[in-house]
Amino acid sequence: MFKRLPVAFLTIPLFALLLPLIANASRLEWDQTEVRIEMEPRQEEARATYTVTNKGEETVRIARVKTSCGCTGSILDRKIIKPGEATTITGTFNKGKRQGLNHNKLEVFLDNQAEAVATLHMIVQIPVLIDAQPKIVYWNPTTSKTDRQIRITLDKRYITEFSEIEYDHSLLIISEEADPTGKADRILKILPMAFDQQIRETVTVKGRGKDGMKAEARLHIFVQP
């Protein structure tokens, strides 16, 4: 007759098998696990380096590095780390059309481990050269037939003045005024010419700065009769 073994009895051998892997992971020492970068407007790629040293007595192998975004990649100096040796992981970030704060993660996995041994953070700030709040305004039968206000702010480090506001004058009325609070550089007041026709219009706010720097922000205007 077979006897049922206690669950604790079964889990102890399994835990014992995992101990070497856990020990190896705990003996890896990182110079840093978080890097903050502020990109320049014309910069397309940012990079961050993370160095890991094997402080244990066993050789370990990095199996893979998983990134949290298609915009983020990784370059591994070497996969096998002998005791006392180190390797470097370089995180790469491609800006594309992104703006603002981008928090990307790189998860590092060792051989025969389902869980990441470390999560590396690459926090990238991309300057918003012309910021518009809100970027979308709309009217429908349930909303008031009054103007909508959009606050425009320039990043004065790069964009020093407005150059143009492009829109269809047959569809929209746009006026400009200073922000009485001083928080924004300009307030746009937008009103459709008519509320009885459907409008899907884009307003482009353009600015310029030193060394030929140019930027624009797009506003989306909707009227649903």
Task: Say what each PLM segment does.
Residues 1-4:
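Positively charged n-region of N-terminal signal peptides that target proteins for export
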Residues 9-20:
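Bacterial N-terminal signal peptides
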Residues 18-58, 113-157, 209-225:
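Long, low-complexity ectodomains and other extracytoplasmic segments of secretory-pathway proteins
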Residues 33, 42-49, 96-105, 143-150, ...:
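Short, solvent-exposed loop/turn segments enriched in Ser/Thr/Gly
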Residues 57-85, 157-184:
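Surface-exposed binding patches on compact interaction domains or structured appendages
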Residues 85-91, 148, 184-188:
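Short strand-edge motifs at loop-to-beta-strand transitions and within beta-strands
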Residues 94, 109-113, 206-210:
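Beta-strand-rich extracellular modules
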Residues 161-225:
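Structured core of small recognition/catalytic domains
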